[in-house]
């Protein structure tokens, strides 16, 4: 049995950033990271669109706003120091008709309150940034950028291991036992003990928390985001990042265009309920995941509230013409033949028992465990700052 001062469950970017922050602040503290897959960062981190978010959308004073603002600076600094490619390409949020002006104004006001560098621009200025866009007004956010978050995560893992700490892959946690002087984590790679445990289990964070004896009110419901990529001959239609004005009643940003750090342009995502927590395709069905979500009172209440929006998202999932139509609101020149299917991602969204989508980061503490129960976008951008916040919670326990 292997021992550590702190064990982290989950080898995605939040877990790895947390481990790295522990090694920076408490170099004498031994760290163990347990990852159920055979490689790091294969799920939410590995399917991330790679945007360095500015924090313009989030409620002032929220954990998302605070951590994103500080996190983007930390992420850019880390990538620069580690010579990981990133690009401050900028972003435009586009209103295509006057009915969207009110929501656009609200986003701009939030951006200013959060300290985001942003500018309201007219149609002529919009065309300077994105000549093919259809908007009549927009917000330009120059500090938004792009990066490969899996590359960042892998580098964090390398730095942790260089300091002599263990990253154990193939170690799905199947049991958690508390005892007087710590916690035993039973995994498919053997048993491990730790004085403190941090749960960064992503799509399975609520189940891990319950294994550890916690009773979170929320439950993870997986939403698949499906993408297309522009063929090379159409990539000139998008110079940076192009976003619509999002529906303020729905917690997703709408289909948009993202220029990628390694080349190419992604289009999407939609947001559809996935029938498995790792349901990257329509045919991925896990009966436990499906029944657990479908019988959860919070899910049923959410479905009643958002059924119309949900049907629209589902229609875009099954109908490429409907997906193309949504993209054409931003760039009318887009045609179906410009698009090829790209890998999907799955977002772990915490859902409350009242049907509310938890719209902020959610971190819960118990006796010897810290559970990250909700870490949606912009968690990757914010990961180094989230890790710092977790270490702040951990510090009194290990000093």
Placement of each model-derived feature along the sequence:
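Helical element adjacent to the flavin cofactor pocket in flavoenzyme catalytic cores
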Residues: 139-196, 200, 204-207, 382-395
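Flavin-dependent oxidoreductases
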Residues: 17, 176-286
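C-terminal catalytic lobe of FAD-dependent flavoproteins
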Residues: 282, 294-297, 302-399
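Short beta-strand to alpha-helix junction loop
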Residues: 59-70, 94-104, 139-159, 168, ...
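Dinucleotide-binding Rossmann-like beta1-alpha1 core, especially the glycine-rich loop
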Residues: 50-125, 135, 254-255, 276, ...
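Glycine-rich FAD pyrophosphate-binding loop
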Residues: 23-46
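Beta1/beta-strand and adjacent pyrophosphate-binding region of the FAD-binding site
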Residues: 1-14, 32
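Helix-loop-beta segment of a Rossmann-like dinucleotide-binding subdomain
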Residues: 85-95, 107, 120, 127-164, ...
């Amino acid at each position: 049995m292997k021992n550590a001062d702190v064990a982290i469950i989950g080898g995605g970017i939040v877990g790895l950033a947390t481990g790295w922050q522990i090694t920076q602040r408490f170099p004498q503290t031994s760290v163990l990271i347990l990852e159920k897959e055979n490689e790091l960062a294969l799920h939410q981190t590995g399917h991330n669109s790679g945007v360095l978010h500015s924090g313009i959308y989030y409620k002032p004073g929220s954990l998302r706003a605070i951590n994103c603002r500080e996190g983007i600076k930390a992420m850019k600094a880390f990538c620069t120091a580690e010579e990981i490619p990133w690009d401050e390409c900028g972003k435009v949020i586009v209103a295509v008709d006057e009915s969207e002006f009110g929501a656009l104004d609200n986003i701009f006001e939030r951006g200013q309150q959060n300290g985001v560098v942003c500018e309201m621009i007219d149609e002529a200025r919009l065309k300077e940034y994105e000549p093919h866009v259809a908007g009549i007004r927009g917000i330009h956010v120059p500090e938004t950028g792009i990066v490969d978050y899996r590359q960042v995560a892998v580098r964090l893992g390398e730095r942790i291991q260089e300091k002599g700490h263990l990253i154990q892959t193939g170690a799905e946690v199947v049991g958690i036992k508390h005892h007087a002087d710590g916690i035993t984590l039973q995994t498919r790679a053997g048993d491990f003990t730790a004085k403190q445990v941090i749960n960064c289990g992503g799509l399975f964070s609520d189940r891990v928390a319950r294994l550890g004896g916690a009773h979170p009110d929320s439950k993870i419901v997986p939403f698949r985001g499906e993408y297309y990529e522009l063929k090379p001959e159409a990539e000139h239609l998008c110079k940076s990042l192009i976003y619509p004005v999002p529906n303020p009643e729905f917690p997703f940003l709408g289909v948009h265009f993202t220029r990628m750090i390694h080349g190419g342009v992604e289009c999407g995502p939609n947001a559809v309920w996935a029938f498995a927590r790792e349901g990257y395709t329509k045919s991925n069905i896990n009966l436990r995941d499906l029944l657990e979500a479908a019988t959860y009172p919070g899910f049923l209440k959410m479905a009643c509230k958002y059924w119309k929006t949900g049907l629209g998202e589902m229609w875009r999932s099954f109908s490429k013409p409907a997906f193309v139509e949504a993209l054409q609101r931003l760039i009318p020149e887009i045609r179906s033949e410009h698009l090829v299917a790209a890998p999907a991602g799955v977002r772990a969204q915490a859902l409350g028992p009242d049907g509310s989508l938890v719209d902020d980061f959610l971190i819960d503490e118990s006796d010897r465990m810290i559970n990250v129960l909700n870490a949606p976008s912009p968690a990757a951008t914010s990961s180094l700052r989230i890790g710092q916040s977790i270490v702040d919670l951990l510090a009194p326990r290990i000093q």
